[in-house]
């Protein structure tokens, strides 16, 4: 072994968590090393070639609001953009983009290669140098030593990864990529709570072998939405349709007949798979009453000859995969280019992490991505960003930062993982966010860009554009609040073709709160009698003003709930070294509180098994200590 080079921060793994972690720390001025087994696989979309979706697009836009890469990259790589839940309220609308997986990798590499302070190195990591439970660097498989005071581990599905196709088992975390078994086994010296999770992917199909003529086309939205705050429609490559087909009784009978050959049901795989992205075997067993399951045939790229059949993940033997694929309408002559497979891998209990994603056991070791029990590119990228920025803050001897549950979906993700842990792959949904009316995808920049600028994640160019937008929103909102409409004013709504008579005096902003009145209707009405005509062409600005108005009452209610939430979050528990010293706590409470070491009363509340009685005892204990004028170190 020999010393090679020293860095401020080393990131192991260049998937979605690793790329965001390395980008964040280097943007904040830290000399960063991003090390990966293969440079050619940086930013690979290992499974579904898509970014965003319900609950996920909110994460992507929050990453973007903090200067991250994912939104920028997909804007240059997306070949079909759609708004999901477009007929519902803004709180649950989510953008999804089909990606050209080759363009996505190319564009991710472009941004990383042009990032200052960032070095990319190709080699497998065999061990993390840890002395006295503190990180000091890494060792590569060929004996190179890279020294660093902070290491961020983002190994994805590669720690002791095993791939399954029927009875065939291979070492690997992804097709054509070997697992990081040496590193995984070395980490077992320091971590006892290591579990196994499972994920899977469908077979890939040859495009020319599919009969698209009998299938339903699915087009993207027009005009196409964008992900990044700085994104433009002109950045999008050529847009293409997807296609829809369905499984049938024959498909289901093939699967049932051969279920014993699936490693999921033969006992070969013990890890739990993602609940909300089940294999086709799981779907048939768990939903026996369904006569068919929808499959989206998604192109893997503009010029790609490969189709991704979304919704039919499987690890059945290769010959059975051929039979089940060819039983489906439009796929009767389909040729499988790559067989579907399942992957089982190691993950760590995220409750052993601080909210910054630093290990509670190993000083200066941060962990992000699927190794923390999540599933999905977006969840991994969000964790990578938080780990990267907090690693940089630690180098700079500055206070740590992470968003709270009321500030971002990223905050919900981090809090759920670190407070509750997970026994199955964790996926983000809008339903997980109790303050989702405030955490809309269209106000991510308003919520997070200011702190991003203060942290050094956002450049001056973006800050100026953001500030200008916020000024425009503020001016227009105030203008509407200062326009007084008198009783008996007649207003026509184009939404429901009705004439509205005002019964009492109100402001134009208040009038906009009515569900049947759109911003465009209001402006047309106001311009008909105002001397100074107002025309705002920026759709983002008008949507935000309309949302603020229509959600006004609900937002006020949630802000009251947040005050209560903050009260508990501000009651810190750092002063308690051993919960056995507190009289009245149950044995279960003592064991769980000593085990998970919650940072606040709020976090303690979210630990399974912690009762209101326990919380009351803790609050009384803190109050007594405060009266005795104890100093609490935050």
UniProtKB/Swiss-Prot annotation:
Q: What does this protein do?
A: NAD-binding protein involved in the addition of a carboxymethylaminomethyl (cmnm) group at the wobble position (U34) of certain tRNAs, forming tRNA-cmnm(5)s(2)U34.
Q: Gene encoding it?
A: mnmG
**Which residues are involved in binding NAD(+)?**
273-287
Cofactors, names only: FAD
Q: What is this protein called?
A: tRNA uridine 5-carboxymethylaminomethyl modification enzyme MnmG
Q: How does it assemble?
A: Homodimer. Heterotetramer of two MnmE and two MnmG subunits.
Q: Which GO terms describe its molecular function?
A: flavin adenine dinucleotide binding
Q: What InterPro entries does the record point to?
A: FAD/NAD-bd_sf (IPR036188), GIDA_C_N (IPR049312), MnmG (IPR004416), MnmG-rel (IPR002218), MnmG-rel_CS (IPR020595), MnmG_C (IPR026904), MnmG_C_subdom (IPR047001), MnmG_C_subdom_sf (IPR044920)
List where in the cell it is found: Cytoplasm
| Organism the protein comes from | Buchnera aphidicola subsp. Cinara cedri (strain Cc)
Q: Which Pfam families match?
A: GIDA, GIDA_C_1st, SAM_GIDA_C
């Amino acid at each position: 072994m020999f010393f090679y080079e020293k860095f401020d921060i080393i990131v192991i793994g260049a998937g979605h968590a690793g790329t965001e972690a390395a980008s964040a720390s280097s943007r904040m001025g830290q000399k960063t090393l991003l090390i990966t087994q293969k440079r050619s696989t940086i930013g690979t979309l290992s499974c579904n070639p898509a970014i965003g979706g319900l609950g996920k697009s909110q994460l992507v836009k929050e990453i973007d609001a903090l200067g991250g890469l994912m939104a920028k990259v997909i804007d240059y790589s997306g070949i079909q953009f759609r708004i999901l839940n477009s007929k519902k309220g803004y709180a649950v609308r989510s953008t999804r983009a089909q990606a050209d997986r080759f363009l996505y990798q190319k564009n991710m590499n472009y941004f990383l290669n042009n990032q200052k302070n960032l070095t990319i190195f190709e080699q497998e990591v065999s061990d993390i140098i840890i002395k006295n439970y503190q990180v000091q660097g890494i060792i590569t498989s060929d004996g190179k030593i890279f020294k660093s005071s902070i290491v961020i581990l983002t190994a994805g599905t590669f720690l002791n990864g095993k791939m399954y196709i029927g009875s065939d088992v291979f070492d690997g975390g992804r097709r054509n990529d070997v697992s990081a078994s040496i590193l995984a086994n070395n980490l077992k010296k320091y971590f006892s709570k290591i579990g196994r999770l499972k994920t899977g992917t469908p077979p890939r199909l040859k495009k020319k072998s599919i009969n698209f003529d009998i299938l339903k086309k699915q087009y993207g939205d027009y005009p196409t939405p964008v992900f990044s705050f700085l994104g433009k429609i002109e950045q999008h490559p050529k847009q293409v349709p997807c296609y829809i087909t369905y499984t049938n009784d024959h498909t289901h009978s093939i699967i049932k007949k051969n279920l014993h050959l699936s490693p999921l049901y033969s006992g070969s795989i013990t890890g739990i798979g993602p609940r909300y992205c089940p294999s086709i075997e799981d779907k048939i067993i768990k939903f026996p009453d369904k006569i068919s399951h929808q499959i989206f045939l998604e192109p893997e790229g503009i010029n790609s000859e490969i189709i991704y059949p979304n919704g039919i993940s499987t690890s059945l033997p290769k010959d059975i995969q051929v039979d089940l694929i060819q039983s489906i309408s439009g796929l009767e002559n389909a040729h499988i280019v790559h067989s579907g497979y399942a992957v089982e891998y190691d993950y760590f209990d995220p409750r052993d992490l601080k909210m910054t994603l630093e290990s509670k056991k190993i000083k200066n070791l941060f962990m992000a991505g699927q190794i923390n029990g999540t599933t999905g590119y977006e969840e991994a990228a969000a964790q990578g960003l938080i780990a990267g920025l907090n690693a940089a803050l630690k180098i700079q001897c500055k206070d740590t930062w992470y968003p709270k549950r009321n500030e971002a979906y990223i905050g919900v993700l981090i809090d759920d993982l670190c407070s509750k842990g997970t026994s199955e792959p964790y996926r983000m949904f809008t339903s997980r966010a109790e303050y989702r009316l405030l955490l809309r995808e269209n106000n991510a920049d308003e919520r997070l860009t200011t702190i991003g600028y203060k942290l050094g994640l956002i450049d001056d160019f973006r800050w100026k554009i953001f500030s200008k937008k916020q000024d425009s929103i503020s001016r227009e909102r105030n203008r509407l609040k200062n326009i007084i409409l008198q009783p008996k004013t007649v207003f026509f709504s184009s939404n429901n073709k009705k004439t509205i008579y005002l019964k009492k005096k109100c402001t134009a902003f208040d009038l906009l709160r009515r569900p049947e009145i759109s911003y465009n209707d209001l402006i047309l009405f106001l311009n008909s009698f105002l001397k100074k005509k107002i025309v705002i062409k920026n759709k983002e600005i008008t949507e935000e003003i309309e949302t603020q108005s229509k959600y006004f009452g609900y937002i006020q209610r949630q802000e009251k709930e947040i005050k209560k939430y903050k009260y508990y979050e501000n009651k810190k528990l750092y002063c308690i070294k051993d919960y056995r010293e507190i009289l009245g706590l149950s044995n279960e409470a003592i064991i769980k509180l000593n085990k998970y070491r919650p940072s606040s009363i709020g976090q303690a509340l979210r630990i399974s098994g912690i009762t209101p009685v326990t919380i009351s005892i803790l609050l009384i204990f803190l109050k007594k200590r405060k009266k005795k004028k104890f100093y609490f170190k935050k």
